[in-house]
Amino acid sequence: MSRVANNPVQLPSGVQVDLKGSDLSVKGSKGAMSLSVHSSVAVVQEDNVLTFAAKDGAKSSKAMAGTVRSLVNNMVTGVSVGFEKKLQLVGVGYRTKVTGNVLNLTLGFSHPVDYVLPEGVTAETPTQTEIVLKCSDKQLLGQVAAEIRAFRPPEPYKGKGVRYADENVRRKEAKKK
C-alpha cells in the first residue's frame, strides 16, 4: 500500500498557505491556487511544513490522504517554481507561432489550426517546430498539451505529428509485397 501521505510537504520561502475549514489556498510568486480538502483527510500546518493524515483508519481515507498530499505538493511547486511541457512538431511543413494568447499551427491540413490558450498558460516558440508551454497548474498544463497533441498525434509509420519532447514513438515497418 502506498505511503505517500506520510511524507510532509515542505513550504519554500515566499509561499503562503491558508487553511480555512476544508478549503486550502496556496499563494506564491507565480500565482494563487485553491483546493477543497476531502472530509476524511486532516491537514496540519506547523511552521513551514504541511502534514496529512486520514481521520479514520479506512483504506479509502488513507488513499485520499495520499491524493490530497500529491495535489497540494503540485500546487506548492506550481506557485513557487511552475511547470513546463515541451512539444515538438515533426513533419514537412509543420510549424507554429504564437500571436498573443493564440497558438497558430500549420499541421498539413487544408486550413491552419488556431488554438486559444486558456488563462494562466503561456506558450513560447524557440523554433518553428518547438512549443514550450508554461503554467502554475500541472493538471491544466497537461490538459492543454494533450489537446494540442490531439490535433495531429504522431503516426507509427513515419513518426509525423505533434509529440511531447520526451515521447518515444513506436515505429512500424511498412507492408512489403
Curated annotation (Swiss-Prot):
Presence of keyword rRNA-binding: yes
Pfam families referenced in this protein's UniProt entry, alphabetically: Ribosomal_L6 (PF00347)
Keywords recorded for this protein, A-Z: Ribonucleoprotein, Ribosomal protein, RNA-binding, rRNA-binding
Keyword check for rRNA-binding: yes
One GO CC annotation: cytosolic large ribosomal subunit
GO molecular function: rRNA binding; structural constituent of ribosome
Leader sequence segment: none
GO BP field: cytoplasmic translation
InterPro entries in the cross-refs: Ribosomal_uL6-like, Ribosomal_uL6-like_a/b-dom_sf, Ribosomal_uL6_a/b-dom, Ribosomal_uL6_bac-type, Ribosomal_uL6_CS
Protein family per UniProt: Belongs to the universal ribosomal protein uL6 family.
Cited function: This protein binds to the 23S rRNA, and is important in its secondary structure. It is located near the subunit interface in the base of the L7/L12 stalk, and near the tRNA binding site of the peptidyltransferase center.
PANTHER family associated with the record: 60S/50S RIBOSOMAL PROTEIN L6/L9 (PTHR11655), LARGE RIBOSOMAL SUBUNIT PROTEIN UL6M (PTHR11655:SF14)
Subunit architecture: Part of the 50S ribosomal subunit.
Protein name, per record: Large ribosomal subunit protein uL6
Protein species of origin: Saccharophagus degradans (strain 2-40 / ATCC 43961 / DSM 17024)
Lineage: Bacteria, Pseudomonadati, Pseudomonadota, Gammaproteobacteria, Cellvibrionales
